A protein has these predicted regions:
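Interaction-mediating elements
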Residues: 1-124
Length: 124
């Protein structure tokens, strides 16, 4: 169920690097949240050079957002965010002041996958 959306300026990372990022996101998410790897989905979106802004100024900014089921502990979320930050910055070279990560939790009853309403965390 977790859906990761990586938003980054076009040309910053190669298709090969996107594949590495997707594998690392999957590895991190499954090791921290204890879910099967086929639950993890990753999508890359790019924007044209000159179309990113930070503080109202043009910038090469990036974001990694994850929609996931609620029910994970604060410790799990903190651990995952820290690992994701380190990995994403290492593989993209994005400056610390240009990267934003977020987790957006939703009730499992608000998500479907494989034609089924998702179960609560811990009931996979």
């Amino acid at each position: 169920m977790p859906l990761y959306t990586a938003i980054i300026q076009e040309g910053i990372v190669s298709v090969e690097t996107e594949a590495k990022i997707a594998k690392e996101i999957t590895r991190i998410h499954t090791s921290v949240m204890k879910v099967p790897k086929n639950f993890v989905r990753v999508v890359f979106l790019s924007y044209p050079k000159g179309s990113g802004f930070t503080g109202g100024e043009k910038a090469t900014t990036a974001a990694l957002n994850c929609v996931l089921r609620s029910g994970h502990t604060a410790e799990e979320k903190t651990d995952m965010l820290q690992q994701l930050w380190t990995m994403f910055q290492r593989l993209t070279g994005i400056a610390t002041d240009q990267l934003a990560l977020s987790l957006q939790e939703i009730p499992s009853s608000n998500a479907m996958e494989m034609g089924q309403i998702m179960q609560a965390v811990g009931h996979e």
